[in-house]
């Protein structure tokens, strides 16, 4: 067990303590030196640590630095076993050249001559060593002249000043002292320097974010309290004059950048995954042997997630959710449905054109049938003549109007023509002072009207069949008017009878007055009333109502009830079927 112990002083510097002799030393004892350290020492290198704990290696002679262990040509025996009186060192352009006692010298040349030939006059290699007290002022002056501020890290000082300023190497074996001087310099900056740094916020932000980038422990999810602990010893945080709010905002801006980068990375990954998923699903859906689409449940049970080895083998699919897969499935299905719908619309458009052509051909057929279609023509009249015609057969099963619809449209046109001619005929009869004789039969009346119309020039182009239909319409119209007139007269009479009954009720029921024993007595009593006079000469009707009237009855008579029903019924429009099937 070693008698040496490693310890640290108040400043954090490492020293070594001998438990037997009770002595301490800054130099590491030989007993504690590892093989790696021996190798470094024998080749003129030393190991040190930066402020954030990263190990680096430097050569105080050549002023070289490296983050990795340098590669040496061969291992050197431990220092204790070396024979210093047989070794001489020389540096040429930073490379070590060793001459040992075993190496052969050229005749006539001495070691001193060779050392003189390969002497290196670089200022970095020929720095006069100083004590720490002597070097402190010049070291701080070096920092000031190079405009070092709190935005610098100690590793930057090593890499930049250590390679170009000899003052950095005045004390070459104590990097902790140099870091101490750096901290002291930052603490003792002048007011002007602090004000200048305070105004250079952009410079601070750039350096602060660079420091955050170099810290591998700060992630996009790191919060400010955690970050403060991680960067507490960083000079830019510890000695910066920038307020805490600006530091925190700069940190947040950096974190926002990391978050955006993370999101963008995830977005790119997901975009790639969705693209590959689309190709994967297209291959499944479009190559399916089924006549219908693969349902979502079938897809879920056999082709995606842990149900499919092929799906699980794609590492990009790991970022996809059920919702992502469902959305892509719906997009593909909708695309296929839209394609089918477009094809169906194209087919409908072609069929629409064919349907229109078929209807036009059938209309031509209706104009060519052997029997001329009139206002009273029925479907059964023309069907035998068209049932075998291709123009009729091509109409079967078509969209839009059917053959019957087109036929009825044709008949309606003829009816409208007859209706218009009937109005002209009616005016002609008025102009000719034609008198209707109710004693004549409809047939005689028809013959008389036809003679009048045939002699009128307005009907020269109207054929006899149409004139017959026009006259039939006139006779029917007159008969309907006569029937309407009679119906109105009957309704008015029934109303008068009802009003007379109400008169009797008011006179003999509500007043309590006894009903006269005879109609003659009642006639004298009621003769001046309007209801009595309204019946005119219909004395028999008045007598019948009087005899049927009973004073104790308050309900309307049967005749009045019938009159009301007749009146109500007469106001209703008689409905007929829209299409009468006559075959």
Swiss-Prot record:
Q: Where is the FF domain?
A: 132-188, 201-257, 262-332, 354-413, 427-488, 491-552
- Where does it localize? Nucleus
Q: Name one Pfam family in it.
A: WW
Q: What is the effect of changing residue 274 to A?
A: Temperature sensitive growth at 36 degrees Celsius
Keywords in alphabetical order, please: mRNA processing, mRNA splicing, Nucleus, Phosphoprotein, Repeat, Ribonucleoprotein
Q: Which residues carry this modification: Phosphothreonine?
A: 576
- Coarse class of the primary localization is nucleus
Biological process, per Gene Ontology:
mRNA 5'-splice site recognition; mRNA splicing, via spliceosome
A GO cellular component annotated for this chain's UniProt record is:
commitment complex
The record's section on InterPro entries has: FF_domain, FF_domain_sf, Prp40-like, WW_dom, WW_dom_sf
**Signal peptide feature range:** none
Paired cysteines (S-S)? none
Record's Gene3D superfamilies? 2.20.70.10, FF domain
SUPFAM superfamilies, per this entry? FF domain, WW domain
Q: Per the database record, which ranges form the WW domain?
A: 1-31, 42-72
**Recorded GO terms, molecular function?**
RNA binding
Give the domain section of the comments: The WW and FF domains bind to the phosphorylated carboxy-terminal domain of RPB1.
Q: Which family does it belong to?
A: Belongs to the PRPF40 family.
Q: Quaternary structure? A: Interacts with CRM1, MSL5, PRP8, and the RNA polymerase II largest subunit (RPB1). MSL5, MUD2 and PRP40 interact to form the commitment complex 2 (CC2), a precursor of mature spliceosomes.
The job of this chain, per UniProt, is described as: Required for pre-spliceosome formation, which is the first step of pre-mRNA splicing. This protein is associated with snRNP U1. Two commitment complexes, CC1 and CC2, have been defined in yeast. CC1 is a basal complex dependent only on the 5' splice site. CC2 is a complex of lower mobility and is dependent on a branchpoint as well as a 5' splice site region. This protein is involved in CC2 formation where it binds to the branchpoint binding protein MSL5, bridging the U1 snRNP-associated 5' splice site and the MSL5-associated branch point 3' intron splice site.
The protein, known as: Pre-mRNA-processing protein PRP40
Query: What species is this protein from?
Result: Saccharomyces cerevisiae (strain ATCC 204508 / S288c) (Baker's yeast)
Lineage here is: Eukaryota, Fungi, Dikarya, Ascomycota, Saccharomycotina
What gene name is given for the protein in this entry?
PRP40
């Amino acid at each position: 067990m070693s008698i040496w112990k490693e310890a640290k002083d108040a400043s954090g510097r490492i020293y070594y303590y001998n438990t037997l002799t009770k002595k301490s030393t800054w130099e590491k004892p030989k007993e504690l030196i590892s093989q790696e350290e021996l190798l470094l020492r024998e080749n003129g290198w030393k190991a040190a640590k930066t402020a954030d704990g990263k190990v680096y290696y430097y050569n105080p002679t050549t002023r070289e630095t490296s983050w990795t262990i340098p590669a040496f040509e061969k291992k050197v025996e431990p220092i204790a076993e070396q024979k210093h009186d047989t070794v001489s060192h020389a540096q040429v352009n930073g490379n070590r050249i060793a001459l040992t006692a075993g190496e052969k010298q050229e005749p006539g040349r001495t070691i001193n001559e060779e050392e003189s030939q390969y002497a290196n006059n670089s200022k970095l290699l020929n720095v006069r060593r100083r004590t720490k007290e002597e070097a402190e002022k010049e070291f701080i002056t070096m920092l000031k002249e190079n405009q070092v501020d709190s935005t610098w890290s100690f590793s930057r000082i090593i890499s930049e000043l250590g390679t170009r300023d000899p003052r950095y190497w005045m004390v070459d074996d104590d990097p902790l002292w140099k870091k101490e001087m750096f901290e002291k310099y930052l603490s003792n900056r002048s007011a002007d320097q602090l004000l200048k740094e305070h105004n250079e916020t952009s410079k601070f932000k750039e350096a602060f974010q660079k420091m955050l980038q170099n810290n591998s422990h700060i992630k996009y999810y790191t919060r400010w309290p955690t970050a403060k602990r991680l960067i507490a010893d960083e000079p830019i945080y510890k000695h910066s004059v920038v307020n805490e709010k600006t530091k925190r905002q700069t940190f947040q801006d950096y974190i926002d950048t990391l978050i955006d980068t993370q999101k963008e990375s995830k977005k790119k990954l997901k975009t790639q995954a969705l693209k590959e998923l689309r190709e994967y699903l297209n291959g499944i859906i479009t190559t399916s042997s089924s006549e219908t689409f693969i349902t979502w449940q079938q897809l879920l049970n056999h082709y995606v997630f842990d149900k499919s080895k092929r799906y699980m083998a794609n590492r990009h699919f790991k970022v996809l959710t059920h919702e992502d897969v469902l959305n892509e499935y719906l997009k593909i299905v909708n695309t296929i449905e839209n394609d089918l719908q477009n094809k169906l619309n194209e087919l409908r458009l072609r069929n629409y054109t064919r349907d229109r052509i078929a209807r036009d051909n059938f209309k031509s057929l209706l104009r060519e049938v052997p029997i001329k279609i009139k206002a009273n023509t029925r479907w059964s009249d023309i069907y035998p003549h068209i049932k075998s015609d291709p123009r009729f057969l091509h109409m079967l099963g078509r969209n839009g109007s059917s053959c019957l619809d087109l036929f009825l449209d044709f008949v309606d046109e003829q009816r409208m023509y007859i209706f218009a001619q009937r109005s002209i005929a009616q005016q002609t009869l008025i102009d000719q002072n034609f008198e209707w004789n109710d004693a004549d039969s409809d047939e005689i009346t028809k013959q008389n009207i036809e003679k009048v119309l045939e002699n009128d020039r307005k009907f020269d182009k109207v054929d006899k069949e149409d004139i017959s239909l026009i006259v039939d319409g006139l006779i029917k119209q007159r008969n309907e008017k006569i029937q309407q007139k009679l119906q109105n007269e009957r309704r008015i009479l029934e109303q008068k009878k009802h009003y007379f009954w109400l008169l009797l009720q008011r006179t003999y029921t509500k007043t309590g007055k006894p009903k006269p024993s005879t109609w003659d007595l009642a006639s004298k009593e009621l003769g001046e009333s309007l209801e009595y006079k309204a019946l005119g000469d219909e004395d028999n009707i008045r007598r019948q109502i009087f005899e049927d009237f009973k004073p104790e009855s308050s309900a309307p008579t049967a005749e009045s009830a019938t009159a009301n029903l007749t009146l109500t019924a007469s106001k209703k429009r008689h409905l007929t079927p829209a299409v009468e099937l006559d075959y």
